[in-house]
């Protein structure tokens, strides 16, 4: 459990997610056990604690129906495939995986299992994007010929890049700005305007930060 996973757990136990109950959580770090023990659902039920994903899948499968994956990108495929193999639904935080091959493998496993598979792209719920989507679908914007979007709010400081050993690295994250922040923009583009027919990309390295992954996309 990391910072995002902790946030999701608190939202569920607080009753902020309708029809969802937190029945189990995987905690590998000893210092978070006390935090895990404090997780109590609104009905007074405590969440079970497992010390590894392997333990959850092997001994705890009867206590849950779905899995939320909020781990570093490169772990998504393995965890999702194990969950689908156990007949569980999967809600995976973005991105699906670190490369297209892993993402397609996850999609194939989901299809074969017949279970629900969803991705967490929270910006689709922003009121501005919901309104734009409505305007496009209703034809209020006419025949759209060109779209240009520049987003500068995702500039990350060195503190962010150093906040996790897996961040901003090919080994841990699978890339830099494009896979971390840029995917939000790419998701909104295809959600609002459909899939592109052609792509061109320019990805600078070392423009703002001294690391080997892309720091602008």
Describe the function of each predicted region:
Residues 47-52:
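Short acidic-hydrophobic, aromatic-tinged amphipathic segments that line or gate anion-handling sites
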Residues 6, 77, 183:
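Residues forming the Rossmann-fold NAD(P)(H) cofactor-binding site
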Residues 210-217:
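Short, intrinsically disordered, charge-balanced linker/junction segments flanking boundaries
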Residues 53-63:
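Short amphipathic alpha-helix with an adjacent loop that forms part of the alpha/beta core around
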Residues 1-44:
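N-terminal Rossmann-like dinucleotide-binding module
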Residues 22, 46, 64-67, 141-144:
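Local beta-strand N-terminus motif with an aromatic residue
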Residues 66, 72-73, 77-124, 139:
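Beta-strand-loop-alpha-helix segment that lines the small-molecule cofactor/substrate pocket
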Residues 123-210:
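Predominantly a Rossmann-like dinucleotide-binding segment in NAD(P)-dependent oxidoreductases
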